[in-house]
Structure formats: C-alpha cells, structure tokens
C-alpha cells in the first residue's frame, strides 16, 4: 500500500475545495457589479487591476514556493485572504474597495498555483506527476461544478450574496484538507525539481534567468500570453452579453457557463494526464490552442443564450488540457535544475500580461462596438497564438532547454 495514499487523497479533496476559493468570485464578479450599476468597461478595468497584481506576484510566488517548506501554510493563508477580500466587496462594492479586493485576489491566486504544484511534485515526484496533475485538475473541475451548481441555486433563490457565503464555507473545508496532508510525505527538494544527487545541497537562487536561458520555456510563455489575452475575457463577456439582453437570470446563467465547461474539463483532465504520461505535452497544448479560436467564433456569431453550450464545452477542452499540460511541461523542461516553481511562476507572469489586459480590451470594444466585435477581436488573438505555436514549436528540445538552464545558473 502506498504510504502517501492518505496525503494524496486529501490533496485531491483540497483541489476540490479550492476550486471555489482561489479565484475569488470569478465570473460572478461581472454580473454582481452590473447589478450595482457598473458599466462594461469599468468592470474590465477593475478586473485588469487584479490581473496586473497577479502578474507582478507570480514570479516572486514561484520563488517563495521554491524557498519555503511551509507550503501548506501558504495555501491556507491565501485562502483566508481571498474570502476576506470578497466579503469586503459584498459590504462596499465601490471602485476603491473592489479594486483592493481584486488586487488581493490576484496576488493570492498567483501564490496558490505554484504552491499546489510544489506540494504535488513533492509528494509524487517526477514519475508520478503527469497522472497526479490529471487527478488534481479533475478534482478541481469537479469542485467547480459542485460550487457553481450550488451557487446558481442559492443565487437564484437568495441572490448573489449567497455566493459569498458558499465561498467562505469552501475556504474552511480547504483548511481542513490542508491539515490532513502529512508534512513528512512532502520532499521539499523534489518539490523544487532538484535531482536526487543534489537534494539537500545549498539552495539555489530563483531568478528570471530561468526563463531567459531556455528557448522552450520562452516559447511556452509567449504562446500562453496570447492564449490568455484572448481567453480571459470570454467567459465574463459571455455572461455580461446574455444579462445585458435581459434573457437570463444573472446568477443562474453565470453558474451554467461554469458548469458546462467544468463537466467537460473533468474527463479531459483525466485523459490528458494519461496521455501525457506516455506521449508528452506538445500535442495537448496544440489541441488547447486550436479550441480557443473556435470558441470565440461561435460566441461571436451565435447571438443567443444557448451559445453557452458549445462555447463552454470548447473552454472545457482548452482549460482541461492546459491545466495538466502547462505545469507538466514546465516540470519536464526544468527537471533537475532546482527551479521548477520559479519557472512556472515566470511562465505564469508572462501569460498574466495577456490575462490582465484581456478584460479591459474586451470591455472597451464591447462598449463602443458591441459584444460581437469584442468576440471577433478575441478570436483573432487566439488564431495568432496558434500560429505562433505552430511556427516555432519543437517537440523534442526539452532536454536542451534544461541543460541551458542548469548551465546558466551555475
């Protein structure tokens, strides 16, 4: 019997509970603010502030994960801070308070991601990472389905404030899960990506040279930046578009947009973990990048609330694959360097530039030219991401990238 089975079970449950916590209100933020009289571009601006804060925090967050052993504490404190910021927004949804809440959520979200990746790698090691990443993502998406279903029902009967209460409950459950993961099951040297022969040695300093010295990592970061510049605004924009036409209940429709995508993500993540274990991550990323422009075209052309079905099914494919492929690809590229978490943080920082700008860009276009034009712009960016990846990607240069990183950091 695997002596770490208990910790792995609680790690899965942790991913389930964090699904409703780590991103704050997520797509519910847009419809919540619209209910308080906010314009589409103002919503985009405040969401962009949160994205910028997260972008600036991701590389230090990766360095923190590489450096500290108290990864469980980092995740726990982050969960509490996200809920506190969201409850503050419920009390006073003015611009200053909303901006502060989103900045805090962005920073905490940047920290939780690498911390969970570090915990996972520290428990299962490189050999077990692809399959466990798939399980992590499947549990995370299942948690999103559960939370969105409950949030939609609660919001329908008691209004959007019920969503805030649900988030607080899930945060408490996350703390319980963290407390049941045994510290002794976490190898903190392996969690950083050190080779066994280097484990226990002098800690290496995490640095931006990790990104600059590896062409595969730079390519991955560029593709992800364009992907998120297109993707980040699509779900909030879909919800705002439907609500603005008066054809849908805000809480219920937003919940449905989440549920449809997450139901697709669960099997996608499980299959992606198994596929990556045998074939690697290149094809998974390619398929994810292909799904995004298709999603944007459907959303822009089909002016109906029912568009959420194909649009969010395609979102489930893209997000389900990347949730497994991105951390797995970074871990494989940087294996043995001792800088996996800072590498993941660096890639996340670059992609966050796109994610931070996406809501503001889409909000401005939607206000002045309509929602169809906004979806067209996002679709064009998605096609550019696919072109860049197809033009530059090389399947088998991970080893060369890892060697360049190790040499640069000696």
For the regions a language model picked out, list residue spans one by one.
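Hydrophobic core of transmembrane alpha-helices in multi-pass small-molecule transporters
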Residues: 16, 85, 97-111, 307-321
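Loop-to-transmembrane helix entry
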Residues: 39-49, 247-263, 339-342
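Cytoplasmic helix-loop-helix junction between adjacent transmembrane helices
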Residues: 103-142
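Symmetry-related core transmembrane helices of the 12-TM Major Facilitator Superfamily/SLC fold
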Residues: 163-179, 375-390
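Juxtamembrane intracellular "pre-TM" segments in multi-pass secondary transporters
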Residues: 1-5, 185-220, 405-410
